[in-house]
Amino acid sequence: RCMNLKQGIIIICLLLVLPLYGQSLSDYNPIWNTPSKGSHESMPCGGGSIGMNVWVENGELYFYFSRSGTFDANNGFLKGGRVKIHLTPNPFESGDFRQELKLEDGYIEITAGKEKNIIEIWADVFHPVIHVDVKGSRKTDIEVSYESWRYKNRLLRKDESHFNSYKGNPPEGLFTAKDSIGFIDNQIGFCHRNAAETVFDRTVERQGLN
């Protein structure tokens, strides 16, 4: 009877272990075999406090990026901007294409072109840094552009306030403030400065609590 009990325990353990052994996180990696038509077909990636949306469109590599806690005066969560990367020679003009999100290791791998150029994109989990690593059999020139749509104050329409704390009842003249963007040698610097008065102050005033 004791031997039968041990055999039963072993069989149960095997039944529990075998299904787990057959499952690998890499089996669920999203894989695309064609470039995207726009940002609505982007692939998420991130690490630590950094988040990205990555895609290839019309022969260019793009990604939006954001960081935890980047709220503006209206309590809207703002992306930092968009980065555009152009490669010469361009591997996206011909040959095969494959974009894969490596779930287990937390990075995106793009393989493109007749020579199977490899591009790896990931975020450092310990520092707010985004890495783009380009590998190929030939010398490749890389042109990187930073793009921002907050180059001036932008008046918000009523429906556009659903992304901030005003929702469907924004005050008249509400706007998203512009960023400060500058260039130092071969570097680009930018920041967003919130006004002294925020959505909290306006809410207190509206509710007569000031």
Predicted regions and their residues:
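Sec-dependent N-terminal signal peptides
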Residues: 7-20
